[in-house]
C-alpha cells in the first residue's frame, strides 16, 4: 500500500510540475514577437554640442559618435571615421531619447476619428484580456510628431475606461508597416490599472 501511495504521489508531482511549466510558458512566450530590425546607417559624429548624458553629466563643446543609430561614444574631440557624416551642433543641445511610459499613440490615432479609436474595451470594469498591441495603427501621424519632440520609445497602454484596462506594449518609435516592426525586442508587457 505504501508503495502505491508513493507512486501516486510521485506521479502527481511530475504532472503538476509539467502543468505549471506549461502555464508559465503560456504567459512568457510572445505569440506576436517583435520583427524590429535596426536600420543600417553609417557613422555620424555630432560635434560641438552641449551634451546631456542622462546620468546628470553635462558635456560642454561635446561630441557624440553614432554607429547604426546607436551612441558608441560621448566626449570631447572624438575622432570621426573617414566615412562619417559630421554635423556641427554649435549652440545646440543633444540629449538621450525620451521614453513615454504612458502613451495612447496608435490606439487613439490622429486625426481622431471613430474608426481609429481603439483604446478602450468599455464592456466591463475588468478587461485584462485586452492587448493594446492589437489596436496600434503604426501609421498614426502622432508617432512622427512625438519623434520630432525626441520621443524614441513608448509604452502604449489601453485607455482608462476600466479599473483594469488590459496589457500595454513597448514600442520603438520607428516607421513600420506593422506594430510588430515597432515592438521593442524583449521588453516586458505593462498592465493598465
Language-model features and meaning:
Residues 4-14:
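Bacterial N-terminal signal peptides
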Residues 42-49:
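Conserved N-terminal strand/loop that marks the beginning of ABC ATPase nucleotide-binding domains
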Residues 21, 26, 30-35, 168-193:
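Metal-coordinating catalytic core of metallo-dependent amide/deamination hydrolases
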Residues 29, 36-38, 51, 55-95, ...:
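Histidine-rich, glycine-flanked metal-binding segment
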Residues 16-19:
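Sec/Tat signal peptide C-region and signal peptidase I cleavage site
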Residues 92-158, 162-166:
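Metal-associated gating/positioning segment near the N- to mid-region
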Residues 45, 84-88, 190:
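Conserved beta-strand scaffold positions in the cores of enzyme catalytic domains, especially
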Amino acid at each position: 500500500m505504501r508503495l502505491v501511495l508513493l507512486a501516486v504521489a510521485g506521479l502527481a508531482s511530475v504532472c503538476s510540475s509539467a502543468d505549471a511549466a506549461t502555464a508559465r510558458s503560456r504567459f512568457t512566450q510572445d505569440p506576436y514577437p517583435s520583427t524590429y530590425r535596426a536600420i543600417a546607417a553609417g557613422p555620424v559624429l555630432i560635434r560641438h554640442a552641449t551634451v546631456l548624458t542622462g546620468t546628470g553629466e553635462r558635456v560642454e563643446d561635446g561630441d557624440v559618435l553614432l554607429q547604426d543609430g546607436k551612441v558608441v561614444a560621448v566626449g570631447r574631440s572624438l575622432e570621426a571615421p573617414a566615412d562619417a557624416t559630421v554635423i556641427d551642433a554649435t549652440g545646440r543641445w543633444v540629449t538621450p531619447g525620451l521614453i513615454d511610459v504612458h502613451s495612447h499613440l496608435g490606439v487613439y490615432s490622429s486625426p481622431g476619428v471613430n474608426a481609429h479609436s481603439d483604446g478602450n474595451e468599455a464592456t466591463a470594469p475588468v478587461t485584462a484580456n485586452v492587448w493594446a498591441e492589437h489596436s496600434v495603427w503604426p501609421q498614426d501621424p502622432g508617432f512622427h510628431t512625438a519623434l520630432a519632440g525626441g520621443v524614441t520609445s513608448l509604452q502604449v497602454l489601453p485607455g482608462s475606461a476600466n479599473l483594469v484596462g488590459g496589457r500595454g506594449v513597448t514600442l520603438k518609435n520607428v516607421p513600420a508597416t506593422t506594430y510588430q516592426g515597432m515592438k521593442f525586442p524583449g521588453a516586458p508587457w505593462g498592465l493598465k490599472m
